[in-house]
Amino acid sequence: DGHKVLLCHGSPWDLNYYLYPDATYEVRSRIERTDVDIVFFGHTHYPIIWDDLNVLSVNPGSVGQPRDRSPGACWAIWDTRENNISLKREIYDLKNIIQACKKYDPNDKYLQDVLTRE
């Protein structure tokens, strides 16, 4: 539909930069320096939609390691014709995932801890 899109891990200016939901406007406005209509970024696992910039900016969240203390998978749907974006959630049974983690590597508690954060 003619949109210029940038996909990046951390931010448009640094692969490993953390763009958190509470980022200042000064930091967020750096996204406007890109020559695109929409930026999708990740790294923090926090779902974000910033529509107050000249560039629509979206972190779709995380399917397996949510950091916003909301259970389940989070992702974004982008309607390119309407240029409308929405975040979606799907709750899933963590017990099965945690059991699989324990079976695969019983000594690695990191992923188990991430999945059960409150």
Located regions from the model:
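Active-site environment of divalent metal-dependent phosphoester hydrolases
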Residues: 13-15, 38-51, 65-70
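Generic secondary-structure boundary/loop-capping signal
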Residues: 16-17, 45, 60, 112
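Active-site neighborhood of phospho(di)ester-bond hydrolases with catalytic His/Asp-centered motifs
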Residues: 8, 38-43, 57-61
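Hydrophobic transmembrane alpha-helix bundles
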Residues: 28-37, 41-43, 76-87
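Acidic, His/Gly-rich catalytic cores of divalent-metal-dependent hydrolytic chemistry
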Residues: 51-118
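Short acidic-hydrophobic surface loop/beta-edge motif
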Residues: 1-2, 50-52
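Conserved catalytic scaffold of divalent metal-dependent phosphoesterases
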Residues: 1-38
